[in-house]
Structure formats: structure tokens, C-alpha cells
UniProtKB/Swiss-Prot annotation:
This is Venom allergen 5. The lineage of its organism: Eukaryota, Metazoa, Ecdysozoa, Arthropoda, Hexapoda. It comes from Vespula germanica. Belongs to the CRISP family. Venom allergen 5-like subfamily. PANTHER family: CYSTEINE-RICH SECRETORY PROTEIN-RELATED. Residues 45-189 form the SCP domain. Keywords: Allergen, Disulfide bond, Secreted. Expressed by the venom gland. Disulfide bonds join C4-C17, C8-C101, C26-C94, C170-C187. InterPro entries: Allrgn_V5/Tpx1_CS, CAP_dom, CAP_sf, CRISP-related, V5_allergen-like. SUPFAM superfamilies: PR-1-like. GO terms for cellular component: extracellular region. It is found in: Secreted. It comes from the Eukaryota. SMART domains: SCP (SM00198).
Length: 204
């Protein structure tokens, strides 16, 4: 397993080394489905790129204060099967939160996670979970540096629109826990965004 040889920026044992099986490992949670369909992957990618272009064109009016300034170096993301594989391995653990070591040979990797639950027997569409990350833009103050914003409130948004990020790959699992129907989405991004001394994108 080559992932066992990767030295991550943040240290730790690589997720794809620690968990080699692609089967869910969810203890007392009842797994209903895991993995994303081809259509869901396309929808997630399109949602990311539509939002990045909305920001780039200066059409995002939300913020603290809004609007967000337009960008001059915002490119579309492409889907990475490798990033998606590592994201799926992590999602399969049913542990909400970030794993420690998910980098790949060519670059460090960032991550967004989202979890929704319903007592009705239905699961949110993955695009709805991606939109939860976009909604954090309402708390972003573009008049301040990235590092001066409250990272806990805006970190998913900033990773989504980080201009130097080129690829995304996601994994998903749906399970039942104490009568709650939960959908857990993990997206990995490379190269990673959210470096404290940098900015999200170059403004026009």
C-alpha cells in the first residue's frame, strides 16, 4: 500500500493506509448505502464550479459585509478519482470530522465535511450538503484578510473557492443511527486551500 509511505504535512498515518478495506466500518450504525453515482459526482462537481464562477464574476451578494469581490484567477475544478477514493475510505468510517492524513504524492489535500439527518426515511441530495458550505459566505468579511476571519465559521466556503485548488473528489455514506437517517459527505481538495498566510483568490 503506497499510501503508507506518504508523509503528510500534518503528520499521522494515512487514511488509505490505516483503513485498507472499502467496506463501511460503522459499529452500531446501520449502513443504508455508500459511494456516489456517476450522476452525483457530476452534480457535485458542477455545483462547485457554478459557485466558483459566481464568485469570480462578482455575483455573490452575501457576506459580512457583502458583496464578495470578483476574482481574476478562479479556474474550474476537475474531478479526481484518487481524491474521491481517499474521501470515500474516510466517509466509510462514519466518524464525523476531519481525518488527519489524506495528502497524495503530488500535493497536500484539504477537506470539507457535512452531515445532515432526518427522522423521516429520506436522505438529502449531496448537492444540498455542498450548498451548506457555500452558505458560510454570509459570515465572510472580504475587507479583512483570510487569516483575520473566524475560520470555524468560513473554512468550508474558503476551501470551495480557493483559487489555487485544482481538483476535488468526494465520498458519501448514508446510515441510520437512533432513528435518524444521516447522510455524511466528505470532499477532498488538491492542492489544499486555507493556508493562513495566503488569500482565497486574486481580486479584480
Amino acid at each position: 500500500n503506497n499510501y503508507c509511505k506518504i508523509k503528510c504535512l500534518k503528520g499521522g498515518v494515512h487514511t488509505a493506509c490505516k483503513y485498507e478495506s472499502l467496506k463501511p466500518n460503522c459499529a452500531n450504525k446501520k449502513v443504508v448505502a455508500y459511494g456516489l453515482t456517476k450522476q452525483e459526482k457530476q452534480d457535485i462537481l458542477k455545483e462547485h464550479n457554478d459557485f466558483r464562477q459566481k464568485i469570480a464574476r462578482g455575483l455573490e451578494t452575501r457576506g459580512n459585509p457583502g458583496p464578495q469581490p470578483p476574482a481574476k484567477n478562479m479556474k474550474n475544478l476537475v474531478w479526481s478519482d484518487e481524491l474521491a477514493y481517499i474521501a470515500q475510505v474516510w466517509a466509510n468510517q462514519c466518524q464525523y470530522g476531519h481525518d488527519t492524513c489524506r495528502d497524495v504524492a503530488k500535493y497536500p489535500v484539504g477537506q470539507n465535511v457535512a452531515l445532515t439527518g432526518s427522522t423521516a426515511a429520506k436522505y438529502d441530495n449531496p448537492v444540498k450538503l455542498v450548498k451548506m458550505w457555500e452558505d458560510e459566505v454570509k459570515d465572510y468579511n472580504p475587507k479583512k484578510k483570510f487569516s483575520e476571519n473566524n475560520f470555524l465559521k468560513i473554512g468550508h466556503y474558503t476551501q470551495m473557492v480557493w483559487a489555487n485548488t485544482k481538483e476535488v473528489g468526494c465520498g458519501s455514506i448514508k446510515y441510520i443511527q437512533d432513528k435518524w437517517h444521516k447522510h455524511y459527505l466528505v470532499c477532498n481538495y488538491g492542492p489544499s486551500g486555507n493556508f493562513g498566510n495566503e488569500e482565497l483568490y486574486q481580486t479584480k
